[in-house]
């Protein structure tokens, strides 16, 4: 079986939205995405450009971005039933998961 990046991106993006919605509520997620759209990104695009999402979160939420990034990374790790590495940046977490998914295929 060949690694399907599109499917990976969709699964992780969906899981991130569901997890963050369960923590903060769907209205909060809509507000976060509205702010992120100002920077031409969205939580659903976390796998396509995690650094862009991270940068936008830091611009919008400043110190609160670290909290959101940890929650987003945790949601992504839960897809693979992995324990999150708390020291991972958001980009590192997505890259680690992408590598794992490629190895599993």
Give the label of every model feature segment.
Residues 1-105:
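Long, compositionally biased intrinsically disordered regulatory segments in eukaryotic proteins
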């Amino acid at each position: 079986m060949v690694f399907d990046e599109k499917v990976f991106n969709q699964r992780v993006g969906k899981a991130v939205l569901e997890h963050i919605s369960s923590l903060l509520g769907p209205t909060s997620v809509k507000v976060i995405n509205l702010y992120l759209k100002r920077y031409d990104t969205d939580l659903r695009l976390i796998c396509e450009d995690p650094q862009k999402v991270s940068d936008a979160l830091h611009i919008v939420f400043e110190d609160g971005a670290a909290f959101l990034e940890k929650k987003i990374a945790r949601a992504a790790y839960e897809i693979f039933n992995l324990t999150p590495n708390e020291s991972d940046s958001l980009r590192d977490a997505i890259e680690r998961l992408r590598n794992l998914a490629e190895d599993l295929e």
